[in-house]
Protein backbone atom coordinates (compact mmCIF):
# COMPACT_ATOMS: atom_id res chain seq x y z
CA UNK A 1 0.00 0.00 0.00
CA UNK A 2 2.82 2.44 0.83
CA UNK A 3 4.26 1.88 -2.66
CA UNK A 4 0.96 3.02 -4.16
CA UNK A 5 0.87 6.13 -2.00
CA UNK A 6 4.42 6.96 -3.07
CA UNK A 7 3.53 6.33 -6.72
CA UNK A 8 0.53 8.66 -6.52
CA UNK A 9 2.44 11.34 -4.68
CA UNK A 10 5.43 11.28 -7.02
CA UNK A 11 3.48 10.95 -10.27
CA UNK A 12 0.56 13.24 -9.59
CA UNK A 13 0.94 15.47 -6.58
CA UNK A 14 4.64 16.16 -6.46
CA UNK A 15 4.98 16.49 -10.23
CA UNK A 16 1.98 18.88 -10.22
CA UNK A 17 0.13 16.75 -12.78
CA UNK A 18 -3.62 16.96 -12.33
CA UNK A 19 -4.80 14.04 -10.21
CA UNK A 20 -7.55 11.99 -11.79
CA UNK A 21 -10.74 12.68 -9.88
CA UNK A 22 -12.57 9.56 -11.04
CA UNK A 23 -11.70 6.74 -8.65
CA UNK A 24 -12.35 4.10 -11.34
CA UNK A 25 -9.91 5.75 -13.75
CA UNK A 26 -7.34 6.07 -10.99
CA UNK A 27 -7.81 2.40 -10.06
CA UNK A 28 -7.33 1.38 -13.70
CA UNK A 29 -4.18 3.51 -13.94
CA UNK A 30 -2.77 1.90 -10.80
CA UNK A 31 -3.66 -1.57 -12.07
CA UNK A 32 -1.85 -0.84 -15.34
CA UNK A 33 1.13 0.30 -13.26
CA UNK A 34 1.21 -3.20 -11.73
CA UNK A 35 -0.44 -2.72 -8.35
CA UNK A 36 -2.86 -5.28 -6.88
CA UNK A 37 -6.53 -4.41 -6.52
CA UNK A 38 -6.65 -4.98 -2.74
CA UNK A 39 -3.65 -2.70 -2.16
CA UNK A 40 -5.17 -0.04 -4.42
CA UNK A 41 -8.41 -0.07 -2.42
CA UNK A 42 -6.47 0.26 0.86
CA UNK A 43 -4.36 3.13 -0.48
CA UNK A 44 -7.37 5.06 -1.78
CA UNK A 45 -9.14 4.52 1.54
CA UNK A 46 -6.01 5.80 3.33
CA UNK A 47 -6.10 8.98 1.22
CA UNK A 48 -9.84 9.46 1.79
CA UNK A 49 -9.32 9.14 5.54
CA UNK A 50 -6.49 11.68 5.37
CA UNK A 51 -8.82 14.15 3.67
CA UNK A 52 -11.56 13.47 6.23
CA UNK A 53 -9.21 14.21 9.16
CA UNK A 54 -9.25 17.88 8.17
CA UNK A 55 -12.96 18.07 8.96
CA UNK A 56 -12.80 15.72 11.91
CA UNK A 57 -14.05 16.53 15.35
CA UNK A 58 -11.81 13.86 16.86
CA UNK A 59 -10.92 14.98 20.38
CA UNK A 60 -7.23 14.32 19.82
CA UNK A 61 -7.26 16.84 17.00
CA UNK A 62 -9.12 19.54 18.91
CA UNK A 63 -8.27 19.45 22.61
CA UNK A 64 -4.63 19.80 23.47
CA UNK A 65 -2.22 21.67 25.63
CA UNK A 66 0.72 23.18 23.76
CA UNK A 67 2.98 22.28 26.69
CA UNK A 68 1.94 18.63 26.86
CA UNK A 69 4.30 15.78 26.06
CA UNK A 70 3.24 12.97 23.72
CA UNK A 71 3.24 9.48 25.25
CA UNK A 72 3.23 6.81 22.55
CA UNK A 73 1.25 3.59 22.84
CA UNK A 74 3.00 0.25 22.54
CA UNK A 75 1.63 -0.22 19.01
CA UNK A 76 2.85 3.24 18.01
CA UNK A 77 6.31 2.52 19.43
CA UNK A 78 6.47 -0.71 17.44
CA UNK A 79 5.59 1.11 14.23
CA UNK A 80 7.68 4.24 14.94
CA UNK A 81 11.14 3.54 16.32
CA UNK A 82 13.10 5.95 18.52
CA UNK A 83 14.59 7.69 15.49
CA UNK A 84 11.14 8.31 13.98
CA UNK A 85 9.66 9.53 17.26
CA UNK A 86 12.65 11.81 17.77
CA UNK A 87 12.18 13.21 14.28
CA UNK A 88 8.53 14.01 15.01
CA UNK A 89 9.60 15.84 18.17
CA UNK A 90 12.27 17.72 16.21
CA UNK A 91 9.67 18.82 13.64
CA UNK A 92 7.45 20.13 16.43
CA UNK A 93 10.34 22.03 17.96
CA UNK A 94 11.18 23.75 14.66
CA UNK A 95 7.46 24.44 14.05
CA UNK A 96 7.08 22.28 10.94
CA UNK A 97 4.43 20.27 12.81
CA UNK A 98 1.98 21.40 15.43
CA UNK A 99 0.11 19.06 17.78
CA UNK A 100 -2.78 18.52 15.36
CA UNK A 101 -0.53 17.78 12.39
CA UNK A 102 1.61 15.42 14.48
CA UNK A 103 -1.51 13.49 15.48
CA UNK A 104 -2.66 13.37 11.85
CA UNK A 105 0.75 11.96 10.88
CA UNK A 106 0.59 9.33 13.64
CA UNK A 107 -2.98 8.45 12.64
CA UNK A 108 -1.92 7.93 9.02
CA UNK A 109 1.20 5.97 10.00
CA UNK A 110 -0.84 3.61 12.16
CA UNK A 111 -3.19 2.87 9.28
CA UNK A 112 -0.37 1.79 6.97
CA UNK A 113 -0.05 -1.96 6.60
CA UNK A 114 3.71 -1.81 7.23
CA UNK A 115 4.83 -3.45 10.50
CA UNK A 116 7.35 -0.65 11.12
CA UNK A 117 8.37 2.51 9.31
CA UNK A 118 11.86 3.68 8.60
CA UNK A 119 12.63 7.38 8.90
CA UNK A 120 12.64 7.96 5.13
CA UNK A 121 9.11 6.53 4.83
CA UNK A 122 7.91 8.62 7.77
CA UNK A 123 9.22 11.74 6.05
CA UNK A 124 7.06 10.97 3.01
CA UNK A 125 3.97 10.42 5.17
CA UNK A 126 4.61 13.78 6.83
CA UNK A 127 4.96 15.42 3.42
CA UNK A 128 1.65 13.88 2.28
CA UNK A 129 -0.13 15.13 5.39
CA UNK A 130 1.31 18.64 5.04
CA UNK A 131 0.35 18.75 1.37
CA UNK A 132 -3.24 17.78 2.15
CA UNK A 133 -3.85 20.29 4.93
CA UNK A 134 -4.39 23.84 3.64
CA UNK A 135 -2.36 26.64 5.19
CA UNK A 136 0.82 24.63 5.70
CA UNK A 137 2.70 25.66 2.57
CA UNK A 138 5.72 26.94 4.51
CA UNK A 139 5.91 23.77 6.61
CA UNK A 140 5.56 21.70 3.42
CA UNK A 141 8.49 23.55 1.84
CA UNK A 142 10.61 23.06 4.97
CA UNK A 143 9.78 19.36 4.98
CA UNK A 144 10.58 19.08 1.29
CA UNK A 145 13.98 20.63 1.99
CA UNK A 146 14.58 18.10 4.77
CA UNK A 147 13.74 15.23 2.42
CA UNK A 148 15.72 16.36 -0.59
CA UNK A 149 18.74 18.00 1.04
CA UNK A 150 21.92 16.10 0.35
CA UNK A 151 24.52 16.17 3.11
CA UNK A 152 27.88 17.21 1.71
CA UNK A 153 29.85 15.04 4.12
CA UNK A 154 31.45 17.95 5.98
CA UNK A 155 31.02 18.15 9.72
CA UNK A 156 32.01 21.82 9.96
CA UNK A 157 31.56 24.70 7.57
Curated annotation (Swiss-Prot):
It holds the Pfam family DUF494. Belongs to the Smg family. This is Protein Smg homolog. It comes from Shewanella loihica (strain ATCC BAA-1088 / PV-4).
